[in-house]
């Protein structure tokens, strides 16, 4: 017959004969008690400080017993610090601290009294009741207790063990090693050295067991790895080194000090057939959990009466929640509309229109905390009927359970709960929850956390995230009690916690033969990139030789050959189609990078549309184009007068609004921040163009707008005796100034290299250089216009009107040497190169400077 097994906590609870209250149930009960004394805080504010105080209170009761003494000490200390309280600011930090401890001296004893009335107890109170019942329990204890593998006891646990030992009703077996047990400098043996001095250990009872295994030769390797996830990528190599002949991985453990590495670790161990995972998969790291976090953030904004939804608050929720086929289509259309119209802030009406029919649309509607809780419970129930994988099912089930628990816990109270409060309560449950895996503990590779290694020995151990701050945790206690107060009253500090971690580490290593310690050498956030001090201790204090291995991501550039794409028959067929519709912009694309031309014109790929939170240069240019087209479109075909342009100047605001409407952007997009600035700059550019033309007219120049956004098509251009291509495109503006026909191309960029010097040697390849792309476009536009009957035999000027230099007016192409006809030779040759089957598309690499 097997003996009855207890954890030490279970035994302490049994002796106390009290029902423990913890977590949310305790918080809500405590708040109700608090409001009987003070009515100055709502539940959300109370929950910001009470959970930390409650842990401190439990520590007072567990390790000192007299919480009143510590509370009075804290009050006295604050009064000393605040000796001049009536001389200064009544609301200063010290004043607030003093008032806090005054309240706690009244509140915590009152809370204890109220809990006792309900026969309830916190973890700390459980220890007090156990202490009271201990002697009677031990006296009537008729079995034999065996305590195995302990390291650090609370005072009550220690008294329980020692009392049973004194009455010869128990045995105790520790697990230690001479290396850290006999060396006073070793924090790992701190508690065990104290226990060795118990009077219960004498000639008739030995202190068992102290081994001498740590000093046995070991193969220890320390890996300095550049990156957190990168540590997991080293695992297959280490495992292949350990198991050269077989792959059952018997007697091998992988220990994760950072639970967030579990998904990446499982990916790296995909080839391992037998794997037992004793640590749970943290619920907070799964997609559904992330969606819930985003959802609560969204509802907090709605609770503050937000008039619209920020698109980036909506999209992650839609992306990460499980959905059916109908939902997928609705979301696809929703995203397409946002991208097409560049909707950054979505009105409630728009959201209703765009997501109408979504099965979980009600999650986005504004509702109070109680209604939202019921909505989430129903949502989780419905989701479980969808086709989802086992991990998702468990994830959703845990959330449903948590929502129901919170609803049941809140129901006895009449609290006005805010969304923020509901979020805190849910996080309390979810952050401590994990999805458990089913495995075979007696075979295969073991994957676990450090605390799960207690009482277990492995021949081969691999420890990941062996960083300072992870092992040990260091001075990261969340407490209201200063270090000196904790030391004064024998409460655990980070020093005791370091000792506990040190014991787990050294005890786990002492029986191993092959030890692999990996740490992340990159400093990021709370990670300093420093290896744990325990590794340094082994290096400096033990006889073991350690092999150090550095694994880093190389930052050296990889020399890659430019991409080359041959012109296959199918590509040549596409080029024949392209010949029927050649735009000047196509040649510009080819000049910049032939591969871009191939992707765009042969494969017909397009850049994906993305939502712009700040107006892009492309859309800024379109905004100005559209506004100018709207204004000048009213005066096409007439010789302009001063009042024509003055009237247009009064309509600039209207033109900008019409341009925004044509872009399908929301007016709200331009109401604040940099987008407001861009709108004002666009307005100023439009005004500057009008004013420039106005000055021309005032000086007696004859100006007529002939066309705007003039479409040119079916313009034949001979490239050799047997072949021709057809040009097409759009010209931003055609006007006549004092009898000269002007072709004007609007640009957001500055004009470059418009003065052309065609040398005899360069006539064939002038426009093969990217720097002449603007001039090439203008020459092609001039050719196209010269082929149209209504413009034949006209004197033509072509130029750029740059929005960046708007006050300079039109800057024309100028032939310093050579002429317009000469320029067309290189246009012809460039097209011939594109069509040449023997010339592949070769990537042109442009240097970038960061």
Where are the language model's segments positioned?
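Ligand-binding grooves and catalytic loops that recognize ribose/phosphate and carbohydrate rings
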Residues: 183-206, 294-297
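Low-complexity, compositionally biased segments
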Residues: 43-45, 54-94, 98-101, 178-180, ...
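Basic/charged alpha-beta structural segments of nucleotide/phosphate-handling enzymes
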Residues: 2-140, 155, 332, 336-342, ...
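Acidic-histidine catalytic/liganding microenvironments
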Residues: 50, 167, 788
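Conserved helicase NTPase motor core
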Residues: 85-190, 221-227, 459-460, 624, ...
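Anion-coordinating catalytic cores for phosphoryl-, nucleotidyl-, and glycosidic chemistry
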Residues: 1-7, 12-21, 203-807, 814-850
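Generic N-terminal initiation segments characterized by hydrophobic and/or small/turn-forming residues
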Residues: 40, 84, 92-95, 112-115, ...
